[in-house]
């Protein structure tokens, strides 16, 4: 089986629009909460998976954002948030289909100059997988950021389809 066209309201998140490179996004799912820190940093481990892999790399750029806002944070997103779901070894490359993949796309050409591999060391091909439905997903990634102890911060986890409402990500 696979996940495609799940019936949900077509919510569009402005921050995900930016992460996806300004293209049309659909079916955003968002979880937000406030928390009080007990130390000087936070970290979360996560995996981004999608049915867009591998066929729709370089065309449907589903996106994920882990937006942190609070004292000392002055990012470009809502509430001055920063997206801390970034590709390891980069300072601002968001985790999306086009930014983590093995370079295969809808024509199946691994040497397409218009669709080179992007951070393939973090991509896991799962086509034909039986345990997890997504055809591809990232290795376990870590979102982290320095914070001020005892202060209240806000986190928003958001994911969306890009350009279509099919082949979901999660």
Where are these regions (language model features)?
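Aromatic (Trp/Tyr/Phe) and Gly/Pro-enriched flexible surface segments
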Residues: 1-170
């Amino acid at each position: 089986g696979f996940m495609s066209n799940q019936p949900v309201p077509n919510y569009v998140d402005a921050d995900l629009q930016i992460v996806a490179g300004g293209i049309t996004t659909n079916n955003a799912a968002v979880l937000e909460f406030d928390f009080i820190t007990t130390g000087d940093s936070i970290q979360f481990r996560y995996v981004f998976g999608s049915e867009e892999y591998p066929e729709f790399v370089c065309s449907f750029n589903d996106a994920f954002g882990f937006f942190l806002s609070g004292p000392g944070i002055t990012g470009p997103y809502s509430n001055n948030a920063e997206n801390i779901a970034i590709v390891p070894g980069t300072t601002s490359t968001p985790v999306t289909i086009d930014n983590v993949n093995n370079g295969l796309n809808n024509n199946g050409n691994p040497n397409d100059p218009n669709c080179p591999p992007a951070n393939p060391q973090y991509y896991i091909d799962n086509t034909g997988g039986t345990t997890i439905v997504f055809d591809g997903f990232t290795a376990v990634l870590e979102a982290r950021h320095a914070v001020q102890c005892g202060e209240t911060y806000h986190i928003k986890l958001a994911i969306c389809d890009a350009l279509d409402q099919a082949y979901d990500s999660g």
